[in-house]
UniProtKB/Swiss-Prot annotation:
Belongs to the MSDIN fungal toxin family. The lineage of its organism: Eukaryota, Fungi, Dikarya, Basidiomycota, Agaricomycotina. Residues 1-10, 21-34 form a propeptide. Coiled coil: none annotated. The keyword Aminoacyl-tRNA synthetase does not apply. This is MSDIN-like toxin proprotein 2. There is a cross-link at residues 11-20 (Cyclopeptide (Phe-Pro)). The keyword tRNA processing does not apply. Processed by the macrocyclase-peptidase enzyme POPB to yield a toxic cyclic decapeptide. POPB first removes 10 residues from the N-terminus. Conformational trapping of the remaining peptide forces the enzyme to release this intermediate rather than proceed to macrocyclization. The enzyme rebinds the remaining peptide in a different conformation and catalyzes macrocyclization of the N-terminal 10 residues. Probable toxin that belongs to the MSDIN-like toxin family responsible for a large number of food poisoning cases and deaths. GO terms for molecular function: toxin activity. Transmembrane segments: none annotated. Keywords: Toxin.
């Protein structure tokens, strides 16, 4: 796992708060991380 993914975790915890479409982004990021 990369530090970038860890740094973005806080934002992913609140997808409806500011990033409603983050669901698709996190899946792509995790796929790249793995």
């Amino acid at each position: 796992m990369s530090d970038i993914n860890t740094a973005r975790l806080p934002f992913y915890q609140f997808p409806d708060f500011k990033y409603p479409c983050v669901g698709d982004d996190i899946e792509m990021v995790l796929a790249r991380g793995e």
